[in-house]
Amino acid sequence: MRKEKFNHGWVFHKGGGSSLEALAGGGTANEQPVTLPHDASVGMTRNPDEPNGSGNGFFREECYNYTKTFSLNPEDADKNIWLEFEGVYQNAFVYINGSYAGKCPYGYGNFYIDATRYVSFTEPNDIKVIVKNGVPSGRWYTGGGIYRDVNLMIADRLHLIPDGVQLATQEVEDGQAIIRVRSTIEYTGIGVRDIMLVTELMDADGNVVASDEMPITTEEHTKQTYQQKIYVENPSLWDEDHPYLYTYRTYIREGENAVDEEIGTFGIRTLQLDRKHGFRVNGKVVNLRGGCIHHDNGVTGTAEFPHAAEFRVKTLKEAGYNAIRSSHYPMSRRLLEACDKLGMYVMDEFADVWTTTKVDFDYGTHMAEWWEHDVSNLVRKDYNHPCVVLYSIGNEIPETGNKFDSQWGKKLADKIRELDDARFVTNSLNLMLSIMDRLPKMMAAAGQGENAEVGEINSMMTSLGDMMGALIASDVAGDAIAESASQVDVIGYNYATDRYEKDGEKYPNRIIVGSETYPQDLDKNWELIEKYPYIIGDFSWTAWDYLGEAGIGKINYEETNSMSFYAPYPYKAAYCGDMNLIGDRRPISYWREIIWGLRDKPYVSAQPPQHHDDPHNMTFWSLTDAVRSWNWKGCEGKPITVEVYADADEAELFVNGKSVERKKIGEKKKFIAYFETTYEPGEVEAVVYKNGVETGRDKIVTASDDVQIKACADRGCVPADESDITYVEIAMVDANGNLNTDAAKDVSVSIEGPGVIAGYGSADPASEENYFDTTAKAYEGRLRAAVRGNGEKGTITVTLKADGCQDVQVQIEAK
């Protein structure tokens, strides 16, 4: 099967909400050429009055049309033609040469269009994709349009179906791996054909290490699945530390010719799950150091590029993560490939809703009719990726507490096991939603009043405060989800640490994962994980900041009785990630790394002194407002709180060489010591001790006000064909290279040569700047630009300018 990107030559315009209007060419006045992937929403002007408001980050939800004219080779007239759309948000209707060819309501799933009957091999073809995204449909920033790749696939009438080759490790023992290969062959022609099905497995150097040939007689108009076994001697195993990938080639040979083939990568590894050991990979116990992520990439929106995916995974691995949860929808192919390559375990999630909608026009309006199609495509997409170890069938599903509606869980789990028996199934339960219909009476019994408000789940959790733990730990909640828990291999608990020990005793066969947890709770969660093998890991909300759910991690410095969950305009980001929007580590990520036992060196940060005496109203999704900075201009002589993170007994703080205090670590919060001192420019240093012996030190210094722009590309080249991006990292530094977080300068960007700026901005969660503006204000001293090729080869020059700074140029080769 020939597979090629189908991303070039598209024309985009807004409007055309009805298919009739779109087919009639409505809205063509504002059309523009685009190359996919393309997030149609991220460049739009945000609106404070947007109906979905904070949930969508005040970005607009609109309808879009994409059109393209293409030609096919007449020599392929006897071939089958498919199009794969890896992601279109949402309600995509596909028309080819004016005829309806197919649709997919789900905005996060990949889908296929069999275009064979609709295309011409002698005349140009027209394709139109109508995207109906004009209504609120998500609880976070969804993006819009064709935001992932489109692929054109051409194959003989006798062919392997798309994603039709599935490899699974059945056993690894005594230096030998047994690999099962299932291949689905379709024959849409006539007559009988005698063929040979061949599978070869090649090592990283391209050497064939195992193979099998199977003779097959194919009959007309059939689709059959065939199974082979191949034996690999002395296999190199895939895991987080050694992500070794083999290449497989499965092809149909007829005579001396290869009629069709599929080539891909595969990792040999075994998975085990039990109460005694917990989760094991290749026989070794693995505790999942996990984080949840959404699908946007900050300044480029939801458009998915290979380098953006690799950058995210690499950054998270460097911060100590070994697992990510794709929340709350199927992970992109690019991200799966990055996780395979770099060694990151994945919990891939089906959906945020089943049949009960959370937003008026979300996937819940289609799930009952489309779930089998979408689950099947999820599993087919994931099957050969060794990184995927868990499938989650849902997130915070209210139906899980209803004895009739919870049967959807059984349907989903059974379907996944039918399609893939080599992985484990979980369900990410929020017990507050599972018992929502019982909450008024439970709250009345607890003295809250039977008319207490029950509404949007995150706001409700915030308003209930400490009472939520008691409700979650109650027998009523446990009984409500008992059947749902029995349907899966691992029960996922969202914000239910209070059940871990209780359920471990009550249910001797239950295995638990913290599928979504408060970032501030990792210290106590990890202690339980290390104590009880049946708790296999923790996935914090979130590993990476994201657009939408604006302000859930903010700290409010004003006196207020409001327990408002979201922040008002101009907030656009959640501001709750270990990594900020542009991928820089925030202090909490170092605290997390220390808890995991992966960092020996202490870490110093400071809370903004301008808010020292203000109230600190925090949500559950924040731990601190500390910044790694000793630049607080205008706050000289004012009190300041310094935080020291360390796995040690004591910490001593020095300001400009003078000892402030020596105190125990963990008195208020495990692995943290808080110091009160007075801000003086210069340097602040922490020295930590175990058993009275110094074990490490860390310091931060004041950068001078005479800052310059420092910029560098994170790689020296970018594909000329527009298929990927390269990041340019920008920082405001003094002559000694020290970052000045106070330097909120406006920095302009321009580009010369064969490239374009695909997104530019900072991590500011409340910036009003558009990511396609040419000027952006540095936030905490940093910015990031994404550079994309424009189809030509040559040298791209990115120029950065700011008042009082020398111009800086960065060169990137488009190859």
Language-model segments: residues:
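Extended carbohydrate-recognition surfaces in non-catalytic/accessory domains of CAZymes
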Residues: 1-84, 137, 143-146, 158, ...
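Accessory beta-strand-rich segments of carbohydrate-active enzymes
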Residues: 3-17, 56-57, 61-163, 187-189, ...
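Substrate-binding clefts and catalytic carboxylate motifs of secreted carbohydrate-active enzymes
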Residues: 4-5, 11-20, 88, 389-391, ...
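Active-site-adjacent substrate/metal-binding segments within catalytic domains
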Residues: 42-85, 89-96, 102-105, 112, ...
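Short, hydrophobic beta-strand segments
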Residues: 115-117, 228-237, 674-679, 772-791
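Extended acidic/polar, glycine-enriched regions
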Residues: 120-122, 184-274, 672-674, 678-682, ...
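Short flexible loop/turn segments that cap and initiate beta-strands
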Residues: 192-198, 241-245, 639, 647-649, ...
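Edge beta-strands of extracellular beta-sandwich domains
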Residues: 261-266, 693-704, 806-814
